[in-house]
């Protein structure tokens, strides 16, 4: 039996979270077309007759000097030191750029085994030729490259085979029925954050966080009170919406997702609160990221 840890790295919106959810068969990491939706290192667990793969979904790799981005980049670097294998995902719709150069430099310097995953092969009008040439120039061998579609589950079985080939014999780190090690509070707060991000202005993902105030199981139903914190007054108005339309929509969609994932009824009550410039507070950023 083989087992090991694999870090999923890549630029924002390359399909890292989609791959994690697809292979593990459950919604573990939130998904959004808006860059850097994932903030934390999210663990997903896949177990079959061959052994166990523990995936670590990391924040999107982005070169920036903002405090929040720097904190997320530290998460990426820390995850690399904990794994046996790096899965570097490239969206074949995008031309290789500065991030790819830096990412490959980090991977090579780590001396850790790696696979380069070219994602979204189900799409047309891609940059596959430019990317293939770029990887060749960087000395990446064909045996280290695999082409997949995480969303359509194309070649994901082959990917799992390649991952196991790079693992050694080892124990099951988690019981077979586990598909994540996240606490329920964190998972619920991430679901609410995902719904708040959807259909709202692009700057909001970087300016809001969710805090669970109350979480109780009452007669077989989840009772949840949660606060959505924003960094300035105008963002509060965007999330609440005209006559409370947006916050109502966020609550309804989050409630349905929570009920589906946890297979129980859910009573969810949301409140939007202002915490000025929270995304510049080192202590709070550290708590949210770690």
Swiss-Prot record:
It is found in: Cytoplasm; Cell inner membrane. Coiled coil: none annotated. Its main location: cytoplasm. Residues 10-17 are annotated as: G1. Residues 119-122 are annotated as: G4. Residues 36-40 are annotated as: G2. Residues 2-169 form the Era-type G domain. It is a peripheral membrane protein. GTP binds at residues 10-17, 57-61, 119-122. GO terms for cellular component: cytosol; plasma membrane. GO terms for biological process: ribosomal small subunit assembly. Keywords: Cell inner membrane, Cell membrane, Cytoplasm, GTP-binding, Membrane, Nucleotide-binding, Ribosome biogenesis, RNA-binding, rRNA-binding. One of its GO terms (molecular function) is GTP binding. Residues 57-60 are annotated as: G3. The keyword Phosphoprotein does not apply. Residues 200-276 form the KH type-2 domain. It comes from the Bacteria. Monomer. An essential GTPase that binds both GDP and GTP, with rapid nucleotide exchange. Plays a role in 16S rRNA processing and 30S ribosomal subunit biogenesis and possibly also in cell cycle regulation and energy metabolism. This is GTPase Era. It comes from Borreliella burgdorferi (strain ATCC 35210 / DSM 4680 / CIP 102532 / B31) (Borrelia burgdorferi). The lineage of its organism: Bacteria, Pseudomonadati, Spirochaetota, Spirochaetia, Spirochaetales.
């Amino acid at each position: 039996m083989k087992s090991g840890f694999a870090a999923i790295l890549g630029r924002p919106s390359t399909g890292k979270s989609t791959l994690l959810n697809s292979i593990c068969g459950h919604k573990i990491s939130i998904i959004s077309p808006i860059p850097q939706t994932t903030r934390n290192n999210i663990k997903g667990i896949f177990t079959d007759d061959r052994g166990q793969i523990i995936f670590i979904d990391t924040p999107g790799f982005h070169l920036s000097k903002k405090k929040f981005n720097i904190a997320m980049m530290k998460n990426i670097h820390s995850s690399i030191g904990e794994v046996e294998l790096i899965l570097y995902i490239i969206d074949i719709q995008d031309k290789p750029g500065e991030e790819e150069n830096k990412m490959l430099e980090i991977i090579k310097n780590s001396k850790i085994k790696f696979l380069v995953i070219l994602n979204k092969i189900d799409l047309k009008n891609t940059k596959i030729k430019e990317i293939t040439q770029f990887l060749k120039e960087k000395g990446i061998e064909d045996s280290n490259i695999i082409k997949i579609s995480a969303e359509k589950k194309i070649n994901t079985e082959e990917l799992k085979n390649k991952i196991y080939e790079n693992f050694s014999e080892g124990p099951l780190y988690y019981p077979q029925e586990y598909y994540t090690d996240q606490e329920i509070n964190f998972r619920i707060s991430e679901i609410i954050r995902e719904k708040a991000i959807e259909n709202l202005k692009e700057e909001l993902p970087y300016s809001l966080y969710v805090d669970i105030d109350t979480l109780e199981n009452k007669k077989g139903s989840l009772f949840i009170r949660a606060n959505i914190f924003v960094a300035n007054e105008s963002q509060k108005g965007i999330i609440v919406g005209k006559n409370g339309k947006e916050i109502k929509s966020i609550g309804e969609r989050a409630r349905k997702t929570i009920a589906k994932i946890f297979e129980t009824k859910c009573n969810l009550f949301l409140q939007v609160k202002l915490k000025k410039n929270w995304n510049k507070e080192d202590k709070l950023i550290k708590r949210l990221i770690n």
